[in-house]
Structure formats: structure tokens, C-alpha cells
């Protein structure tokens, strides 16, 4: 990176490398003209960023994908990290795919998560009660998680985005 900065003639310019979640939260803070923002993106995974009450991003990663929100002994285990009860299992396209069979939606087991999300979103547009149950479950869990996150983050504003929040399902999550 330093070589690129030098080669491009940018070596004298200030720069900072930060997580994309932090950039999103900072953009949200600037857009809202407010500080104390927790940004959450429900997409391929669960991404997060935080702007404190003074308008600063912190030097740590706000990686809530693997932060626990479900402390039950039988909480779902993330296949990648091995973490149990973590946010990615509740607020991502993985969550939709995990919940679909429980809601009675049978999709091919080898169907990639993004495609499963699209199928559930299509069902949601037709007022399918099974799809609605998935989004209500995500919304209920999200409400509890936000209260839990507030124990660690001093936020007054919440920025929610990502593929899972697209369309009617996203409205249901926030209802």
C-alpha cells in the first residue's frame, strides 16, 4: 500500500485503513448530521460499524457477526468460525437459509444462500405466511440484539441496511 501511495504521488496525503462497517457508520453519521451511530448491514454476513457520541470511529473492529446474541446451549453454530449463537446466524442471508426449513419452505440443500434469500423474498412479495414468519423471527431477534448491543455501544441512532432488509421483508424486520 505504501508503494502504491508513493507511485501515485499520494505519499504526503493523510490516509487511514478502516473496516467497511466503520465507513458505512461514518457515512450514516454524516448523512444524519448526528453522532452516536451504530450501523448494521444484514447481507452475506452481519457487518457493523460505530461512530461514538463525539463523531469518532474507534480503532477496533466492530465485528458483530461473531459476537454472541443467543446464549442457549443449543443455539446454532456458525460453520465458518465455530462460534455458537453469533449474530451472523440471525441477521444475514445465512439466517434466512437456516430459518427457511423451520418455516416450511423447502429449497434445494445445495442452493447458495444468496439464491435462497431471493426465493424467500419472492415468497414475501406474494404474502406467503412462511416467508413472513422468517422475517418476523429475524425482527424479534434483532430487537433483543439491539438492546444487547446497547450495553456495549453508546448509540442514539441505528442505521440498518443490506440485502436481507430489501423489500417487504425488511419492512417486516423493522415493524
Say what each PLM segment does.
Residues 6-9, 27-31, 36, 73-175:
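ATP-binding/phosphotransfer module of carbohydrate and carboxylate kinases, centering on a glycine-rich
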Residues 1-82:
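Phosphate-binding/catalytic loop of phosphoryl-transfer enzymes
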Amino acid at each position: 500500500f505504501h508503494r502504491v501511495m508513493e507511485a501515485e504521488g499520494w505519499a504526503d496525503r493523510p490516509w487511514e485503513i478502516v473496516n467497511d462497517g466503520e465507513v458505512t457508520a461514518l457515512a450514516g453519521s454524516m448523512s444524519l448530521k448526528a453522532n452516536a451511530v451504530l450501523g448494521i448491514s444484514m447481507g452475506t454476513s452481519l457487518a457493523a460499524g460505530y461512530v461514538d457520541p463525539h463523531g469518532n470511529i474507534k480503532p477496533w473492529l466492530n465485528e458483530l457477526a461473531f459476537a454472541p446474541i443467543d446464549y442457549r446451549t443449543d443455539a446454532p453454530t456458525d460453520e465458518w468460525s465455530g462460534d455458537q449463537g453469533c449474530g451472523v446466524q440471525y441477521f444475514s442471508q445465512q439466517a434466512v437459509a437456516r430459518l427457511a426449513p423451520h418455516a416450511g419452505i423447502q429449497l434445494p440443500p445445495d442452493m447458495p444462500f444468496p439464491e435462497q434469500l431471493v426465493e424467500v423474498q419472492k415468497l414475501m412479495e406474494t404474502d406467503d405466511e412462511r416467508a413472513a414468519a422468517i422475517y418476523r423471527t429475524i425482527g424479534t431477534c434483532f430487537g433483543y440484539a439491539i438492546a444487547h448491543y446497547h450495553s456495549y455501544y453508546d448509540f442514539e441512532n441505528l442505521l440498518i441496511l443490506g440485502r436481507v432488509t430489501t423489500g417487504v421483508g425488511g419492512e417486516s424486520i423493522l415493524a
